[in-house]
Amino acid sequence: MNHLSEKVISLKGRDLLTLLDYTPEEVQQLLTQALELKQKAKNGEPTPYLTGKSLGMIFENASTRTRVSFEVGMTQLGGHALFLSPKDLQIGRGEPIKDTANVLSRYVDAIMIRTNSHESVEELAHYATVPVINALTDAYHPCQALADALTILEKKETLIGKKLAYIGDGNNVCHSLLAIGAKTGMDVTVATPKGYEVDQEIFQRATEAAKETGATLVQTTNPQVAAENADAIYTDVWASMGYEAEQSEREEVFQPYQVNDQLLTLAKKDVSFLHCLPAHRGEEVTASVIDGPHSAIYDQAENRLHAQKAVLTALLIGE
């Protein structure tokens, strides 16, 4: 079997619930492996590192990028991915998470889960005897943040000292961007309306982690302050899944936080625009920005594949 990096920190058997659980060295290793796997894919090199391995994918929420990228990633690595929706599982009929975790652990080599409740993922990981990967909860979206950091790294050549501005709702994506900024030395400024701030416990945990890398994490209600001299500007939908009923109310509150051409003029000339998708053109971002020359959204979406392949290989074979 071809090997990845020769000198690696073994992550075999670990869970990925939040990047705050990983050291800066471990996060950097995942990014390095993602770059290597991306290059191998570009070169047409086979990467059968997970031959004979199976990934159980539990989806309680709809998904395009997450399902396709994990499924294709496992296939490219020589393994198999099994899609499981609530209607396919007894957990959807009230079976305890403990039983589901223990039983699935007897069948598959890792479990990926996308659900609203972070507590449910923590419970699943507690009882599972195989690695559990958080593919989105109400608190974190670590695989997305790895892809985001990978994209910025490719565009800017380093993350250390670069400024990422996140503008919009202080949601799960925002939490994970704070986490990866803290772990990589990337400065992150978050601009949110009052009442829609990031979870302060998560912010404090990320701030504590940032002391190790020198990253600066800032909260503000002013999107112009966030955008000033930014290397990358990031936004997300104003109403995440589960908050659709608040759409009209949020549109009024978030309108001053729209990412548009005027806001981009405050950033560096080579600023990259990021969005985890799906996007609502004309709401959180204008079409001229998301479809313009600064947009890196499709590179970012592709990098979900490579980042997750790095996670899978690291957790399943330790390389």
UniProtKB/Swiss-Prot annotation:
Record: residues binding carbamoyl phosphate: 63-66, 90, 114, 141-144, 276-277, 304
GO BP terms in the entry: arginine biosynthetic process via ornithine; citrulline biosynthetic process; L-arginine biosynthetic process
Listed GO MF terms: amino acid binding; ornithine carbamoyltransferase activity
E.C. numbers: 2.1.3.3
Pathway recorded for this protein: Amino-acid biosynthesis; L-arginine biosynthesis; L-arginine from L-ornithine and carbamoyl phosphate: step 1/3
UniProt keywords, alphabetically: Amino-acid biosynthesis, Arginine biosynthesis, Cytoplasm, Transferase
Reactions catalysed: carbamoyl phosphate + L-ornithine = L-citrulline + phosphate + H(+)
Any one GO cellular component localisation term in the record: cytoplasm
Compartment list: Cytoplasm
Residues involved in L-ornithine binding: 172, 236, 240-241
InterPro entries xref list: Asp/Orn_carbamoyltranf_P-bd, Asp/Orn_carbamoylTrfase, Asp/Orn_carbamoylTrfase_sf, Asp_carbamoyltransf_Asp/Orn-bd, Orn/put_carbamltrans, OTCase_ArgI
Family stated for the protein in its record: Belongs to the aspartate/ornithine carbamoyltransferase superfamily. OTCase family.
NCBIfam families listed in its UniProt record: orni_carb_tr (TIGR00658), PRK00779.1 (NF001986)
Function, as annotated: Reversibly catalyzes the transfer of the carbamoyl group from carbamoyl phosphate (CP) to the N(epsilon) atom of ornithine (ORN) to produce L-citrulline.
Protein name per UniProt: Ornithine carbamoyltransferase
Gene name per UniProt: argF
